[in-house]
Amino acid sequence: MSRAVVLCPGRGSYTEASLGSLDPDHEFVQIAEQCRGDLGLEPLLSLDRADRFEPARHLRPAHVSPLILVKAMIDAAAASEEHEVVAVGGNSLGWYIALCLAGSVSFEEGFRLVQRMSLLQEEHADGGQVLYPRVDGDWKPDPELEAAIEASLESSGGEAMRSIELGGFAVL
């Protein structure tokens, strides 16, 4: 079995070409649909089975981020049947997909996290993430960098928050 690194996609990876790509019988799809049903959201399968791609509908954060997560996890599960996955990574939304893929959180936990973040994104519109180093060139914790992060968070008046720690970086 060959070894593989899986890089998880971020926003922008669900496009018109993605329509019809979700298998309604796949466990991930069923879990996602249950979670969205609990929140009163349009089913992902309804979006994925649409006759045409409508950017205003499909690219809403509350729809597109969960679609990307589910599709990426299905693809990664298929890849892991053919390859030994030795590392995972991603950017932006891909960080959260990588957490699921690596087993740091369950699929359901990761899905709920991504769904909640996408709803917050719609509710608050503005925002973003900053990746800030916490380690030195030898990948050892750097107290000065950590102090700078804390000082920045404290001076933000509650506008900036720590999201996750990812490797040697803080995601703010």
Feature names for model-found ranges:
Residues 12-15, 97, 106, 171:
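Short, flexible micro-motifs
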Residues 102-172:
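Alpha/beta catalytic cores of group-transfer enzymes, especially the acyltransferase/condensing modules
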Residues 1-2, 166:
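Short, well-ordered loop/turn elements at secondary-structure boundaries
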Residues 90-100, 104-105:
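Glycine-rich nucleophile elbow surrounding the catalytic serine of serine-hydrolase chemistry
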Residues 89-90, 172:
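Conserved SAM-binding loop
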Residues 2-89:
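Helix-rich "cap/lid" substructures immediately adjacent to catalytic or cofactor-binding pockets
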Residues 69-73, 99, 111:
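Conserved active-site region of classical short-chain dehydrogenase/reductase
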Residues 75, 95-96, 138:
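A short acidic, glycine/proline-enriched capping/turn motif at secondary-structure boundaries
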